[in-house]
Every structure is written in structure tokens, then in C-alpha cells.
Amino acid sequence: MSQPLTVDCPTCGAPVEWSEKNAFRPFCSDRCKLIDLGAWAAEEHKIAGSEGSEDELYSGDLEPRH
């Protein structure tokens, strides 16, 4: 029988068994999951992109709604 896959919790680093039994995976607990969500909401985490990529997204190609 194979060993269950274990990953580190992204928030606290605790070992976490990656299985359907763990409702919080990849986190070890609801607390760590909420800490991570709060960091995203506070913009402490960001998805990498080039400078000005947000400006390109809103470049004025679309007519404004009135």
C-alpha cells in the first residue's frame, strides 16, 4: 500500500495529508484557510503580471455604460 501524499500547509507549514477526508486541503485547518483568504483580501498576495497590465485591461476599447 502506498503512503498518503503529504504537503505543507501554505500558512503555517504544518504537514497536511492530501486526501478527500481533509476538507481544508491544502490548509491544515479552517483558521489557516481564513488567514490566507484575509491576506488575499488585503492584497498581501498578488498574481504576477507586467507593470501596466491592469491599464491594458481597461484600455478604453469598450464604450462606457450610461
Swiss-Prot record:
Pfam families: YacG. PANTHER family: DNA GYRASE INHIBITOR YACG. Signal peptide: none annotated. It comes from Pseudomonas putida (strain ATCC 700007 / DSM 6899 / JCM 31910 / BCRC 17059 / LMG 24140 / F1). GO terms for biological process: regulation of DNA-templated transcription. Belongs to the DNA gyrase inhibitor YacG family. NCBIfam families: PRK00418.1 (NF001638). The gene is yacG. This is DNA gyrase inhibitor YacG. Binds 1 zinc ion. Its cofactor is Zn(2+). Gene3D superfamilies: Erythroid Transcription Factor GATA-1, subunit A.
